[in-house]
């Protein structure tokens, strides 16, 4: 697993690394652009929203949201990633911190229409994911949603099948979301499968009005 300095070193080449895997439709980034595009469409259905991005990296998705009028908050534990993102989004509120330990102090008093995490939450253990998601639900505005785009699977069998197929490339330091298992703690969780190894997980806050899902292939 990369630490904060490891991500600093990777930052300049991150987008290129993602692109190679995505174009070849291979684990781990198969469907990457589609997932970011679908999350973007969901958010842009609602005007003047406040968005928190956890693990925003170089700001690939949040930059598009920022340019289209969203108020952007973010937390990342790489100072270099923050530096790159600030160049693209000078008016965004970006903070350094390890979100496996919770939100940065500056974010704890803010409520959000959307909280997003794209290809970042897999660095947390299952227990840390549960604690974080419960905390994040408390920071949603009425009708708000958590959107997680990542390497993810509908069930353990699908994960094991992917792990077997990509045994030489599998990252054992990363802990991927399994929708069926997360529903033990979050029974209303929705999983939109996008590829054999990726999808979007959706958790809603109180007074949630369900948006029409985009490209739903399976739960």
Functional labels for PLM-detected ranges:
Residues 48-55:
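Conserved class I S-adenosyl-L-methionine
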Residues 1-43, 58-106, 147-219:
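Class I (Rossmann-like) S-adenosyl-L-methionine-dependent methyltransferase catalytic domain
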Residues 116:
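A conserved beta-strand element that flanks and buttresses the S-adenosyl-L-methionine
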Residues 130-142:
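A short glycine-rich, Lys/Arg-flanked "PGG" loop and its adjoining helix->strand segment in the class I
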Residues 119-120:
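Short catalytic micro-motifs in class I SAM-dependent methyltransferases
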Residues 128-131, 181:
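An acidic, carboxylate-rich microenvironment
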């Amino acid at each position: 697993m990369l630490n904060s300095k490891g991500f600093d070193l990777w930052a300049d080449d991150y987008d290129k690394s993602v692109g190679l895997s995505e174009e070849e439709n291979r684990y781990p980034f198969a469907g990457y652009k589609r997932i970011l595009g679908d999350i973007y469409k969901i958010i842009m259905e609602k005007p003047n929203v406040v968005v928190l991005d956890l693990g925003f990296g170089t700001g690939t998705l949040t930059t598009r949201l920022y340019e289209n009028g969203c108020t952007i908050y973010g937390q990342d534990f790489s100072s270099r990633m923050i530096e790159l993102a600030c160049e693209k989004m000078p008016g965004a509120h970006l903070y350094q911190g390890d979100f496996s330990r919770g939100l940065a102090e500056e974010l704890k008093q803010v409520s959000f229409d959307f909280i997003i995490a794209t290809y970042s939450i897999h660095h947390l253990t299952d227990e840390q994911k549960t604690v974080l998601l419960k905390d994040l639900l408390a920071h949603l505005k009425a009708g708000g949603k958590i959107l997680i785009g990542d390497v993810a699977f509908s069930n353990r069998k699908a994960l094991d099948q992917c792990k077997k197929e990509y045994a030489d490339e599998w990252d054992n330091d990363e802990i991927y979301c399994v929708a069926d298992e997360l529903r033990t703690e979050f029974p209303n969780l929705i999983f939109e499968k996008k590829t054999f190894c990726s999808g979007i997980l959706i958790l809603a806050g109180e007074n949630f009005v369900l948006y029409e899902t985009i490209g739903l292939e399976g739960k």
